[in-house]
Amino acid sequence: MYLNEQLDHWASNTPDSQAIVFEGKAISFAQLAGKVACARGFLSEHCGIRAGDRVAYLGLNHPDMLVILFACESLGAIFNPLNSRLAREEYAFLLANAEPKLCFAEPSFADILHDIGNGDVEILSTGNLYDKPAGRDRSATSVPSSQPLLLVYTSGTTGRPKGVLLSRFAVQVNIENCQDLFQF
């Protein structure tokens, strides 16, 4: 089972169980599934995100980052989390290289992206995810396991950072390996 299939399973079978606890606040599986559905509708209907499009995220670890990841997976889009500890020039390089259609930024990082001035990338606050309810319930797209899901960058120790695409299958195998290693 892939990310959204697992979320759907747990939201159906244990809707009130805790999926995420962040800063002392619990989010149930049903609430997380609702947020993902809302974000999926926002991304597809209001932002025009389709399979293969890249969606970047700049911010600290936050539940919204996971919501965007799950929404991207359900649309066949590619999630591109950006390291929150980089310099402006490094962000400029990564955005030019990754060519995201859209970049979500936490408010504390939005000015950095606006200063870079890459007019090809729409920059939105993570708060926008839930601003406009979807006109209809946009269900998940059927996405093959070979579809790229995650675009991450190497540290660039021997030069510029290099983009690495991970498929849905690769992400799932990593999750399963972590479950085995950490016994959860």
Feature-to-residue mapping (PLM):
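AMP-dependent adenylate-forming
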Residues: E5-S28
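Conserved pre-ATP/AMP-binding loop-to-beta segment of ANL
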Residues: P15, R136-Y153, R160, Q183-F184
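Conserved AMP-binding/adenylate-forming
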Residues: K25, R40-L86
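Conserved AMP-binding A3 loop
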Residues: S28-A30, L149-E176
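Structural detector for helix-capping/boundary residues
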Residues: A30, D53, E89, K101, ...
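Short amphipathic alpha-helical/adjacent loop interface patches that line ligand
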Residues: V36, R40, F79, R168, ...
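Structural core segment of the AMP-binding/adenylate-forming
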Residues: E45, S74-T141
